[in-house]
Amino acid sequence: MSISEMAFQVKEASIRLAAAGTELKNKALENIARLLMERKDEIIKANNEDLQRSREEKLAEPLLKRLKFDEAKIVDVIDGINSLIKLEDPVGKTLLSTELDEGLELYRVTCPIGVVGIIFESRPDALVQISTLCLKSGNGVLLKGGSEARETNKILAQIITEATEEVGIPPNWIKLLETRADVNEMLKMDKYIDLIIPRGSNEFVRYIMDNSRIPVMGHADGICHCYIDEDADIDMAIRIVVDSKTQYVAVCNATETLLVHKNIAPKVLPELKRALDSKNVELVGCSETQKIIPVAPATEEDWRTEYLDYKLSVKVVGDLEEAIEHINTYGSGHTDSIITNSKEKAAAFMSLVDSGNVFWNCSTRFSDGFRYGFGAEVGISTSKIHARGPVGLDGLLIYKYKLIGNGHIVEDYAKRTKSFKHNKMNKQFPL
């Protein structure tokens, strides 16, 4: 079957899926969770095959970490599905209701985007997270995973397909593409695919953005910052920075650059270095940092680099304004955190840093759809159009206007025999 035929099938199925009821969708999600646990041994076996082959092919260590899909990760995705089941169905919610005139009522109502094309590297958990979010939000999904995860992706897509068809979800709502050549053809399928969401490396995402006819939602970089202000609590700062950098390094919300106010740097940097040394983190720093702790020099490129590894660049800054300027110059608009006891400085930081997620006194690792209570996420968007930050169910919806009349025609209003009232109503769409 050609990719255009597969995309057409998903498009057709998405129209029927958009009308599926909440009970049916939740029943399908429950069945997916059940089958994932029942067939976990098959999944782990397939993943071990992918890991072994990828090690032989010298896949980079950060990608190997993302590729691993063991029992703990299976439990995590099942937890995400269970959280998703508990969330309110976002489809069919009335956002606005207006009485245009007597008997003529306008409603703005949420609906699925249609067909979402997901192109992702390494992470099999992304396949489960994204497909279940698409299911709950009523969207069809066309998946293209990396060749390094082909066996894991294949079994996961098979399980999800079987689980949903068993309970009566329209068949063909989900399809997995399996050859590298499919990507470029997929990016031209604007007739069938409504949105592309890429998950992967900087180069990978930029390639998708540069070569797609279809709107792309996502982020190319995860260059996240922590800024330790002069009014910070040192113990708190160390805990937050260590967590932001080392809790899991191979993810887009891990901190890559640390900014430290010059007045607190002599106190906090030596203690912080000891804490990060114990986690085997390599530090590079500016000339002022090197005067305080023994580290290799940071280059201009370091400020622009997403390491996804045990490495952190450190810069001493003169004040809050310099920290904000650095973040807005070198950051990727993903997640940035200030550590301070000053409410005023925190407010300024959170207003002036141009990122989708801005934090005060907490780890950058919190920028995640599951942690935000979204059930899971299809990814992080640094775009300023449609969705920003962790994209959960709401980010997979658009809306349509539904107008109910009783023989109303525009000619009456053009001739001024009738006039518009435009009265706001607090009313749900009745159908």
Swiss-Prot record:
Organism this protein belongs to: Acetivibrio thermocellus (strain ATCC 27405 / DSM 1237 / JCM 9322 / NBRC 103400 / NCIMB 10682 / NRRL B-4536 / VPI 7372) (Clostridium thermocellum)
On whether NADP is a keyword of this UniProt record, the answer is yes
The organism's superkingdom is given as: Bacteria
Q: Which reaction does it catalyse?
A: L-glutamate 5-semialdehyde + phosphate + NADP(+) = L-glutamyl 5-phosphate + NADPH + H(+)
Q: Which Pfam families match?
A: Aldedh
Q: What does this protein do?
A: Catalyzes the NADPH-dependent reduction of L-glutamate 5-phosphate into L-glutamate 5-semialdehyde and phosphate. The product spontaneously undergoes cyclization to form 1-pyrroline-5-carboxylate.
* Keyword Metal-binding part of the UniProt annotation: no
What's the protein here called?
Answer: Gamma-glutamyl phosphate reductase
| Molecular function per GO | glutamate-5-semialdehyde dehydrogenase activity; NADP binding
| Family designation | Belongs to the gamma-glutamyl phosphate reductase family.
Name the InterPro entries on file. Ald_DH/histidinol_DH (IPR016161), Ald_DH_C (IPR016163), Ald_DH_N (IPR016162), Aldehyde_DH_dom (IPR015590), G-glutamylP_reductase_CS (IPR020593), Glu-5-SA_DH (IPR012134), GPR_dom (IPR000965)
> Subcellular location, in the record's words?
Cytoplasm
Q: In which pathway does it act?
A: Amino-acid biosynthesis; L-proline biosynthesis; L-glutamate 5-semialdehyde from L-glutamate: step 2/2
What EC number(s) is this enzyme filed under?
Answer: 1.2.1.41
